[in-house]
Amino acid sequence: MKFYLVGGAVRDNLLNLTVKDRDHMVVGATPQQMLEMGYRQVGKDFPVFLHPETGQEYALARTERKTGVGYGGFSCHASPDVTLEEDLLRRDLTINAIAQDEEGQLYDPYGGVDDINNRVLRHVSDAFVEDPLRVLRVARFAARFHRQGFTIADETLAMMTQISHSGELEALTAERVFLELDKALATDSPQVFIHVLNQCDALAILFPEIHALFGVPQPVKWHPEIDTGIHTLMVLEQAAKLCDDNSVRFAALVHDLGKALSPKEHLPKHHGHGQKGLALIKVLCARVRVPNDYRDLALLVSDLHQNIHQIEELRPDTLVKIFDKADLWRKPERLEQIALACEADAKGRLGQEEWSYPQADYFKQCFMAANKVAVKPIIEAGFKGAEIKAQLQLKRIEAVAEIKQNLNQTDSP
């Protein structure tokens, strides 16, 4: 019986990255032997055990055989006869198919160390094409390790394209697709995830609303990058630089879906694209089971981002209506989220990545002024029922007007 550290822990240690999860493989053991040593079995489909003290996972060495469609269409065989090499062979990428024994000795039968040194994401074997989930996983690894200089091997990208064309991506559950998207959004370079899916023809299948943006032109005056798909990638990249909030990053990703619906005769103009995109966002979110808080923020950003860009030109009453629509009185955290998504949109343009975005500060100042208006003096003044709400609205508009007046005085020579 031999114990090995495997997978991400070995990979991340070789990359000098923080090791978060430590997974182990056991060769030459039976489930009964593991139980006798105090391990607790948790795996149903194949034997996985939890260490009695550390709680870390220990899986018996196993092989897999394709028996059906999708990432769940596999039968597993675990026995003391399965070798280290056989277990590592079933893994997705060579960088994830390295093992380390208890003495620190590395076992690398498929060249994972060389691929780490050369910054290459490469499949372990031709069985790679049997699991459609690997398209999403490799795209996510490409996003996660983009800053370390990793790229996908051409032959691996070709296999990912083969999977896309096989029809097996449709077998992925909505929950699994969103889980991979959410993990990708949390990486340093989430735009790479979308780019890779587009490269291997998976984007059109999994996220057709986003795929439809590529090739759609925009006015060069406002968008030197021209292509709406490229703009979307740039906005997502900026959102990742601005904050760690995945709901903001998702809103950035889908803020311009409506541009795909602009009539060809009107291109490159996109009148009302923010509102046109609302239905598309709802469809995408329903299909992939996006959480409600992600969806609601995305809808607000799509609807309001053009107004926020021109916020200094808006009347005070219009601004208060925006605060109402966004329900900022009850959900003030949305103020920062909307501001960040709009800033990402403004900076996600060729040559404008370092531009300032004063609209965000003005947006926040106006809301904070309006939010300071107290209801108590209005009630004490004798107003009742609907009059209270009307007076509160008027006072909020006055507070915003004062901020606007101060801004105008500051801007005047």
UniProtKB/Swiss-Prot annotation:
Q: Where is the HD domain?
A: 228-329
Kindly list the positions annotated as binding ATP: 8, 11, 91, 137, 140
Q: What is the lineage of its organism?
A: Bacteria, Pseudomonadati, Pseudomonadota, Gammaproteobacteria, Alteromonadales
HAMAP family from the UniProt entry: CCA_bact_type1, CCA_bact_type2
Name assigned to this protein = Multifunctional CCA protein
Binding positions (CTP): 8, 11, 91, 137, 140
Q: What is known of its domains?
A: Comprises two domains: an N-terminal domain containing the nucleotidyltransferase activity and a C-terminal HD domain associated with both phosphodiesterase and phosphatase activities.
Annotated catalysed reactions? a tRNA precursor + 2 CTP + ATP = a tRNA with a 3' CCA end + 3 diphosphate; a tRNA with a 3' CCA end + 2 CTP + ATP = a tRNA with a 3' CCACCA end + 3 diphosphate
Residues at which Mg(2+) binds? 21, 23
